[in-house]
């Protein structure tokens, strides 16, 4: 069984959402928690219009809109460092040796036991912890990186460009460079234009 959680919702504030999620991990050891960072997907949700009106949507290109590589929405009730501190703490708690062992013995059958174990010790568990720690480090030490996260710059940090390069390998040379840039407010502009046209 996998249980899915979205971190960074506008209703979240303080320690409570993260601490209560830890209690869930304790109370349901057989479940595999899947954590997603809140992501605004274009026109998929009308709520995205509100986010765009508030100027909170970031211009992360499509390769990073996978719920964990980037959160393309500035949190409403957290500063970035504080948010990543809490995400890292929760993820470390969820994929600690103790939690992995409890999940292993709570599940019946060889396949779910070992599948959950491998997910925990590979990219989905320990891999994400390493990644989130690097993002936090960049937020602290790299002003241009932080400016992008604060919406003060639209220049995608080289950290993320290098991820795309690594993923594409030899195909990077054919990747259209304009695809790195993305209008995060296209939905809002489209709505405003259609409203003006309908009034006219």
Where are the regions that the model predicts?
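A structural motif corresponding to the C-terminal lobe/cap of the Radical SAM core domain
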Residues: 1-116, 139-140, 197
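A cross-kingdom feature marking charged/low-complexity
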Residues: 120-123
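C-terminal non-catalytic accessory extensions
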Residues: 125-200
